[in-house]
UniProtKB/Swiss-Prot annotation:
Localisation: Cytoplasm
Species in which this protein is naturally found: Wolbachia pipientis wMel
PROSITE patterns tied to this protein: AA_TRNA_LIGASE_I
Function: Catalyzes the attachment of isoleucine to tRNA(Ile). As IleRS can inadvertently accommodate and process structurally similar amino acids such as valine, to avoid such errors it has two additional distinct tRNA(Ile)-dependent editing activities. One activity is designated as 'pretransfer' editing and involves the hydrolysis of activated Val-AMP. The other activity is designated 'posttransfer' editing and involves deacylation of mischarged Val-tRNA(Ile).
Name of this chain's protein: Isoleucine--tRNA ligase
Length: 1111
């Protein structure tokens, strides 16, 4: 009995079991650990793994990011780089606190403080790692290699100390400051947010607001109305009526033209236009017809001219009498005027209630007059600050009015709009209310609308070094590359100072201590635990609140010895912590000072251009004056088939673990790595997983089939194959060259961070291996003698696997590992092997054979179109190309002047000599035709059609298009020199340049197909005679015998006895005519027709015949 050197494989394995076996093998043999430790520390590839939160299960976005990270980390490992993959956990911040509040059944600052900050933070510490073990299961099952045992957590004391160090460094460089400014504020979380947090996923969404137009009564009229004893009012528009109680100023535009309209609610009214009325009409004594006390009694409204049309429309719809004063005012006519406060809450505010010119006022929305509340708008804040108007912000941390607004105290701002509008109506200040739909920022954690309010906060002075960030960004290789100067580059150019403090509980504390007595000011900033222990004389085991808040000491600058240094109550924005990850994860600079480097590669979802990528860039530039990473993939989003986000509410996705158990990890990995989602596009994933199943069927199964074919026949022959690169056979040399070309192309793609292209190359390669090399070499494997030719065929497959499995390993780590181990190569694991070194290959041979394959595919597509089975031989085929013998007969290509030289089978420079007949035989055998005819003239078989590029020609000669179309229809065109087209006749003609036209090949026969980008045509002769019919039937009989062998579970090498039972005379004739052929193809010892069937025979019925076999 022949020895078996390879595993017995089955054609349809349980891929799920195979994957689990490989994962178990990796874990038991510590393959991942070895892949790191066996690489030199002097040859590192630095990879940053952005930390996720562990208070929720992984979703498809996490899996996608993980697949990308793992693929390129594995690839670099195979390039002999040391790639450490330390996993990290984001532990602090709003996600953790919101989760803890929900679990504890409490909400808001007051309830947390009542519950106890110590107990609350203890709960956060536990709950934030709630799903860490589940995460490990998911990550391991997706075949991603990471170091969980040496993980880092942003709540670790060592990590937090490095964050404190970073803050101290920035402070010492003058890049950190404290200030009261208007910031985005989440009243639901009771904390400010940074400006980039308002640009995260769907932070801006549609919101319907009540916009109100309000009349502000001037205490002194503009110069144009000094002599008029009527009230002048400025109309201002706002989408936040709840901010009106805090109004302290009005802003107008420097270059805006303003107009005045008189409103007379009780007088008889005649509508007039701006052009038809004179100024005297408006100012005349007849304009005082309304009774005293009316809210609109002869009042003059002033607003931007651009608002006049809207004003008139509203007035007419609501029967409000009005007249245009036909007086134009400039900003300077209004600037400096004082006006009556809408409400009395802050009527005594210093320098307030005046009109100011501001650059930001436009006419796009509203009235050209902007209501200004410095406590609730950034531009408002700076305008009032420049005029020494104090800031008023009468709301508490939960977004409710304080006692300063007495009749609204305790009312949430968004619930106060109707009350404010009612009060405005009651006092005659209201003009109109409208529904206004606009995009409005929402909290990224609670989905509640944000407000803008003044808050004290610590800031990183990003504006001081943002130009340097723009410079450093030019060094980064972004995928897709438009991110560099587009989404990310533009964001850097418009960067603001970054608010990094949060008035929350669970986070790294801001390491600032201040004197509690303003008479003896002092600020201490700490950058290490050692400094804290030195000054406060205490051993520090935990840096979290509330312990850190208990550290106090006497103010050294206070001679009275009474004031105390106390820590500011804020903690860091968790984005500051994640931006510190590159150095904080290794406790830099307290440890590993020599190790810290910029990342060679990172990847995350594209929105991180305004999140993690940005914070990394800010801190790396400010602290180290260098870019934080060199290569960055910004991937897209996984959506459902309707383009909706995957969500539990919509129930539009399957649990990833269910997908792994149904289709395996490799299939999902390959689907994601091969799609446009890698370069910023989106992936539509159906809940049933059909697209994943297709990968299993069309990618992984073909790879397995080639391996199964090898082991099945190699074990049958008892051969132990070898890696060998030199062969005599054309098809062997082609397959080896094709493999080396694929390996080189995959490496180039992976070097360019294009897994999408690498996956395409892999698919194309296995198409060639299965459907060209193996299929064309079947008879070599089937023959009984183990000669050199057969040995070469085994060695080719074994060699091809040796190279391509290593190239494919980062993309399909599980199936490649299984096959690698089955083929028993030297290295224990394919992932411990090095990526294949580039080998020389015969590019001309590849070009020839690829075109042969293309000719065959074109011919086979004709058969498929007309349902002509491949087993049915045809009489002949015609191949048209430029030269009669250049491609298959070995002569160099040459242009025949009489013919248009665009139709060709091979590119110029490809020559065939001794091997030409072999190519012809391949084509005839593959297409199953008896003869092949090469022609170099179109006459009788095809014609050329001219197709004009109208978009291009329309720009050059737009008035001649109709004439050109006419000449084309009349066939008045020919090719001239330099690939130009002469179109027309002697009286009128035009030269059509290359690119302005396309020549299409159209065959006379319907049994035809073009190939090689319209450079050649194949025509099949489909007429059948008796001889061809009989041969086709004989081939069908062979197929049915082989199918019966498979059904009987006979081995491929088993010799068999065959009995055919049929009443069809044609089938009998075919068997008798092709008797020896059928026996040879089926390894039949005997072949009988309609004889007695013994008891040991296995029988199967088919249409028109039955097949019985015995071994």
């Amino acid at each position: 009995m022949k020895s078996k050197h390879y595993p017995d494989t089955v054609s349809s394995p349980d891929f799920l079991s195979l994957e689990k076996e490989i994962i178990k093998f990796w874990q038991e043999n510590k393959v991942f650990e070895r892949s790191v430790e066996e690489r030199s520390k002097d040859n590192c590839f630095v990879f940053y793994d952005g930390p996720p939160f562990a208070n929720g299960l992984p979703h498809y976005g996490h899996l996608l990011t993980g697949f990308i990270k793992d693929a390129f980390a594995r690839y670099q490992t195979m390039l002999q780089k040391r790639v450490e993959r330390r996993f990290g956990w984001d532990c602090h911040g709003l996600p953790a606190e919101m989760g803890a509040e929900k679990e504890l059944g409490i909400s808001g600052r007051t309830e947390i403080e009542k519950f106890g900050i110590d107990k609350f933070n203890d709960h956060c510490r536990t709950s934030v790692m709630k799903f860490s073990s589940e995460w490990e299961k998911y990550v391991n099952r997706q075949a991603r290699w990471v170091d969980f045992h040496n993980d880092y957590k942003t709540m670790d004391k060592s990590f937090m100390e490095s964050v404190m160090w970073a803050f101290k460094q920035l402070y010492d460089k003058g890049l950190v400051y404290e200030s009261v400014r208007v910031v985005p504020y989440s009243w639901a979380c009771e904390t400010p947010l940074s400006n980039f947090e308002t640009r995260l996923d769907n932070a801006y969404r549609e919101k319907v607001s009540k916009a109100v137009t309000v009349a502000f009564e001037l205490l002194e009229n503009p110069q144009q109305f000094k002599s008029v004893k009527r009230k002048c009012k400025l109309l201002a528009w706002t989408t936040t009526p709840w901010t009106l109680p805090s109004n302290l100023a009005l802003a107008i535009g420097k270059d805006i033209k303003y107009c005045a309209v008189s409103v007379h609610p009780l007088m008889s009214f005649q509508r007039v236009t701006l052009e038809s009325i004179s100024g005297s009409q408006c100012l005349g004594t007849g304009m005082t017809g309304s009774s005293e006390g009316s809210s609109m009694n002869g009042e003059i409204y002033i607003f931007a001219e651009s608002y006049l049309e809207k004003f008139i429309s509203h007035s007419e719809q609501n029967n409000i009498p009005y007249e245009n004063c036909n007086i134009k005012l400039k900003a300077n006519d209004l600037a400096g005027l004082s006006y009556k406060p809408l409400f009395d809450y802050f009527k005594d505010t210093k320098n307030a209630f005046r009109v100011f010119i501001a650059d930001y006022v436009t006419e796009e929305d509203g009235t050209g007059v902007v209501h200004t509340a410095p406590g609730f708008g950034e531009e408002d804040f700076y305008l009032c600050q420049s005029h020494d108007i104090p800031v008023i912000c009468p709301i508490d941390n939960s977004g409710k009015f304080t006692a300063e607004v007495s009749d609204l105290a305790g009312v949430h701002v968004f619930d106060a709009n109707d009350t404010v509008i009612k009060k405005l109506k009651g006092q005659g200040s209201w003009f109109k209310t409208e529904q206004y739909i606009h995009n409005y920022p929402h909290c990224w954690r609670t989905d509640t609308p944000l407000i803008y309010r003044t808050m004290p906060s610590w800031y990183v002075a990003v504006t001081k070094f943002k130009s340097r960030m723009v410079e450093l960004n030019k060094r980064v290789n972004w995928i897709p590359n438009h991110i560099r100067d587009g989404q990310f580059g533009k964001w850097l150019e418009g960067a603001h100072d970054w608010s990094i403090s949060r008035n929350r509980f669970w986070g790294t504390p801001i390491p600032v201590w201040k004197s509690d007595d303003a008479r003896y000011p002092r600020v201490d900033v700490y950058g290490s635990i050692e400094e804290l222990e030195r000054d406060f004389n205490v051993k520090i085991d935990d840096l979290h609140r509330p312990f850190i808040d208990t550290l106090t000491r006497l103010n050294p600058d206070d001679p009275t010895g009474k004031s105390v240094m106390r820590r500011v109550p804020d903690v860091f924005d968790c984005w500051f912590e994640s931006g510190s990850m590159p150095f904080a994860q290794i406790h830099y600079p307290f440890e590993n000072k020599e190790w810290f480097e910029s990342a060679d590669f990172i990847t995350e979802y594209i929105a991180q251009t305004r999140g993690w990528f940005y914070t990394l860039f800010v801190l790396s530039t400010a602290l180290f004056n260098r870019e934080p990473f060199k290569n960055c993939i910004c991937h897209g989003v996984v959506l459902d088939v309707k383009g909706q986000k995957l969500s539990k509410r919509l129930n539009n996705y399957a649990d990833p673990m269910e997908v792994f158990d149904r289709y395996g990890s490799d299939a999902l990995r390959f689907l994601m790595l091969s799609g446009s989602i890698i370069c910023g596009g989106n992936l539509l994933l159906d809940k049933e997983g059909n697209s994943i199943r297709d990968v299993l069927k069309n990618v992984i199964k073909p790879i397995w089939n080639s391996y199964h074919f090898f082991t099945m026949y190699a074990n049958a022959d008892g051969i132990k194959a070898e890696v060998c690169k030199d062969y005599q056979s054309t098809i062997d040399r082609y397959m080896i060259s094709k493999c080396f070309e694929a390996v080189e192309s995959i490496q180039a793609s992976m070097n360019s961070y294009s897994s999408q292209e690498a996956c395409k190359i892999l698919i194309d390669f296995f198409e060639v291996l299965n459907n060209w090399y193996i299929r064309r070499s079947r008879e070599r494997f089937w023959k009984s003698d183990l000669d050199q030719d057969k040995t070469d065929a085994y060695n080719v497959l074994y060699t091809v696997f040796y190279y391509i499995l290593r190239a494919a390993a980062p993309l399909l780590p599980l199936i490649t590992e299984n096959i690698w181990q089955g083929l028993k190569y030297e290295e224990t694991s394919v992932h411990l092997a090095n990526f294949p070194q580039l080998e020389k290959f015969d590019s001309q041979l590849i070009a020839k054979m690829d075109l042969v394959r293309e000719v065959c595919n074109s011919a086979l597509s004709i058969r498929n179109t007309f349902n002509i089975r491949i087993r049915q031989p045809l009489g002949s085929m015609i191949i048209y190309h430029q030269s009669s013998c250049s491609f298959l007969e070995g002569e160099p290509l040459s242009v025949i002047p009489e013919f248009f030289p665009v139709i060709q089978v091979a590119d110029t420079g490809i020559q065939c000599a001794a091997d030409s007949n072999e190519y012809q035989e391949m084509i005839k055998d593959e297409v199953n035709v008896k003869s092949l005819e090469l022609v170099n003239r179109l006459e009788g078989i095809a014609s050329l059609e001219l197709k004009l590029n109208f978009p291009l020609l329309g720009k050059r000669i737009p008035d001649k298009i109709k004439k050109l179309v006419q000449y084309v229809k009349e066939g008045k065109w020919k090719q001239v020199e330099n690939e130009q087209i002469f179109l027309g006749d002697e009286s009128e003609n035009y030269i059509i340049e290359k690119g302005e036209y396309e020549l299409l090949l159209k065959a006379n026969s319907e049994y035809s197909s073009v190939f090689d980008n319209n450079k050649g045509i194949v025509i099949l002769n489909t007429e059948l005679n008796d001889e061809l019919i009989l041969e086709g039937l004989a081939r069908d009989v062979v197929r049915l015998i082989q199918e019966t062998r498979k059904q009987a579970d006979f081995h491929i090498s088993d010799r068999i006895r065959v009995i055919i039972k049929t009443e069809e005379e044609k089938i009998k004739e075919a068997i008798n005519t092709w008797f020896e052929y059928i026996k040879e193809q089926t390894l039949a010892l005997s072949l009988d027709i309609n004889t007695e069937i013994g008891t040991n025979f296995y029988s199967k019925e088919y249409q028109d015949l039955s097949v019985s076999i015995e071994r």
